[in-house]
Amino acid sequence: MQHEDKTPEQQENKTPETELQQENAPATPQEAGAAGSIDDRIAELEAKLAEQQAAVLYAKAEGENIRRRAAEDIEKARKFALEKFSSELLAVKDSLDAALNVGSATLESYRDGVELTAKQLTAVFEKFSIVEINPVGEKFDPNKHQAIGTVESEAESNTVVNVLQKGYTLNDRVLRPALVMVAK
C-alpha cells in the first residue's frame, strides 16, 4: 500500500464536491457549448410550457364565462318570453274593463263591444302564430281533435260534425285539441 504524501492543504482541496465538478466538467470546449445550448433549450421549452399553461387557463376561464352568459341569457329569455304577448293582451283587458264601466249600455252595444274585443284578441293570436282549430267537415285527426262522442249523421263516417270547443295550435304545435262530435 502506497502512501501519498500530501499536505493538509492539498487534502482539504479534494472534497467530494470538487471531485463531482471535475468529473462533470466538459472535457472539450464543444461539450461546454453543447451544455449551454441544452440549458438554453430547456429554458425555451419551460417558457413555452408556461405560455401554454396560461393559454389553457385563459381558455378555461373564457369557456366558463361563455357558459355563465348563456345561462343568464336563457334565464332572461324564460323570464321575459311572454312579455310581448302579455303587453298585447293588455289592450284586450282594457277593452273588457271599458265595457264593464259603461253605465247605461244596451245589449246591442255590449254585443258590439264584445265582438270588437274578440277581434282584438284574434289579432293578437294571429300576431303570435296562435291558430284556431275549427274542424267541422274534416276527417277526425286524433292529433288535433278529441272526440267527445259519436252521432248519427249524413256526413261521411269519422268526420267531425260538431265542435264543442275550438282547439288551438302555436307554431303548428297543439296547445289544446278541439273537442268534437264525430259522425258514425
Swiss-Prot record:
Its main location: cytoplasm. PANTHER family: GRPE PROTEIN (PTHR21237), GRPE PROTEIN HOMOLOG, MITOCHONDRIAL (PTHR21237:SF23). CDD domains: GrpE. Signal peptide: none annotated. One of its GO terms (biological process) is protein folding. It comes from Methylobacillus flagellatus (strain ATCC 51484 / DSM 6875 / VKM B-1610 / KT). Residues 18-27 have a biased composition (Polar residues). Residues 1-39 are annotated as: Disordered. GO terms for cellular component: cytosol. Residues 1-17 have a biased composition (Basic and acidic residues). It is found in: Cytoplasm. HAMAP family: GrpE. One of its GO terms (molecular function) is adenyl-nucleotide exchange factor activity. It holds the Pfam family GrpE. This is Protein GrpE. Belongs to the GrpE family. The lineage of its organism: Bacteria, Pseudomonadati, Pseudomonadota, Betaproteobacteria, Nitrosomonadales. The keyword Cytoplasm applies. Keywords: Chaperone, Cytoplasm, Stress response. Participates actively in the response to hyperosmotic and heat shock by preventing the aggregation of stress-denatured proteins, in association with DnaK and GrpE. It is the nucleotide exchange factor for DnaK and may function as a thermosensor. Unfolded proteins bind initially to DnaJ; upon interaction with the DnaJ-bound protein, DnaK hydrolyzes its bound ATP, resulting in the formation of a stable complex. GrpE releases ADP from DnaK; ATP binding to DnaK triggers the release of the substrate protein, thus completing the reaction cycle. InterPro entries: GrpE (IPR000740), GrpE_coiled_coil (IPR013805), GrpE_head (IPR009012).
